[in-house]
C-alpha cells in the first residue's frame, strides 16, 4: 500500500496532527498544551511508520518518564499496531538504560546482575559513611547529601569535580567526600542508584563507541514523550536523524 493510501487511515486527525504523524525524516518537536493529543500523535506516528514499512518494530524507541505512562504507551501502541507492536522499545529512560547496562555493563566494570539501590539503600549507605567520617547527621542531613549527589550526577560531575566546585565551601567539600566514598562503595557492591543508570549509560556510550554505533544503527526512530522534562544527559543528540521529540 502506498503512503498516500495509508494516510487515509488517519483522516480522524486534524491537519497539524497529520503533519506530525506523516513527518518521517529528521528531527521533529511537538509543542502543545496538556490534553491536546501529543501522546496520541506519537502512537499514530509509530503506526504510520510501521504501516509504511519504513523500519522494523524493534527499530523504534519510544521513551516516557514513569512506569505507568510507559505501560499505557505500550498498550496503546499494541492496540494501534497488533502485529509487531510488542517488539517496539516502549519504556522509561531508566528501564531502557538498565536493559542496555545488563547487556554491556561489563565494559564499564559491572556484572549483568548489578543491584539497583533504592532510597532506603541509599540512606543506609550514606549513614554508614557519615559514621565512618565521624560526621553528625544533624550537621549534614542524609536527605541533603543525597540531594546534592543527585544534582551533581544531573550535571555529570564526578566527586573530584564536585570538590573543585566547592572551593571554600566546607559543607559542599564534605558532601563531595561522602560522594566519593558513596560511589566507591556502590561500585564495590556491584550496585548503582537510579541516577547512575543514566550516567553509566552515557559513560558506556562515550567509552565504547562500537556500542553507541550499535544502538544508533538499531534505532531508526527515537520518540520522547514529555521531552521538556529531559535532563541534558538524557537528551538525544539533535544531529541524529532518528530523533523526534
Predicted features along the sequence, with ranges:
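A basic/glycine-biased coupling hinge at the interface between accessory DNA-binding modules
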Residues: 2-8, 25-28, 36, 47-221, ...
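N-terminal pre-P-loop "Q-motif" helix
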Residues: 10-24
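The Walker A (P-loop) glycine that initiates the GxxxxGKT/S ATP-binding motif of P-loop NTPases
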Residues: 32
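Walker A/P-loop
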Residues: 39
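Conserved small/polar residues in nucleotide/adenosyl-binding loops
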Residues: 233-240
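Hydrophobic alpha-helical segments, chiefly the membrane-spanning helices
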Residues: 244-245
Amino acid at each position: 500500500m502506498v503512503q498516500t493510501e495509508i494516510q487515509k487511515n488517519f483522516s480522524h486527525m486534524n491537519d497539524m496532527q497529520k503533519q506530525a504523524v506523516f513527518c518521517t525524516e529528521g528531527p521533529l518537536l511537538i509543542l502543545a498544551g496538556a490534553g491536546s493529543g501529543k501522546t496520541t500523535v506519537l502512537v499514530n506516528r509509530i503506526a504510520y511508520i510501521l504501516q509504511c514499512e519504513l523500519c522494523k518494530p524493534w527499530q523504534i524507541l519510544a521513551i516516557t518518564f514513569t512506569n505507568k505512562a510507559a505501560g499505557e504507551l505500550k498498550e496503546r501502541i499494541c492496540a494501534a499496531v497488533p502485529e509487531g507492536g510488542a517488539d517496539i522499545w516502549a519504556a522509561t529512560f531508566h528501564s531502557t538504560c538498565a536493559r542496555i547496562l545488563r547487556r554491556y555493563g561489563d565494559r564499564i566494570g559491572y556484572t549483568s546482575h548489578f543491584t539497583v539501590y533504592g532510597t532506603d539503600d541509599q540512606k543506609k549507605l550514606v549513614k554508614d559513611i557519615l559514621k565512618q567520617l565521624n560526621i553528625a547527621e544533624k550537621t549534614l542531613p542524609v536527605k541533603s547529601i543525597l540531594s546534592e549527589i543527585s544534582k551533581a550526577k544531573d550535571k555529570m560531575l564526578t566527586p573530584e569535580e564536585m570538590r573543585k566546585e566547592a572551593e571554600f565551601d566546607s559543607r559542599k567539600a564534605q558532601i563531595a567526600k561522602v560522594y566519593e566514598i558513596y560511589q566507591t562503595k556502590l561500585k564495590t557492591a556491584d550496585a548503582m542508584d537510579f541516577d547512575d543508570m543514566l550516567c553509566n549509560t552515557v559513560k558506556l556510550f562515550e567509552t565504547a563507541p562500537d556500542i553507541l554505533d550499535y544502538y544508533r544503527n538499531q534505532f531508526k526512530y527515537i520518540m520522547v514523550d514529555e521531552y521538556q522534562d529531559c535532563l541534558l544527559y538524557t537528551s538525544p543528540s539533535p544531529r541524529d536523524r532518528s530523533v523526534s521529540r
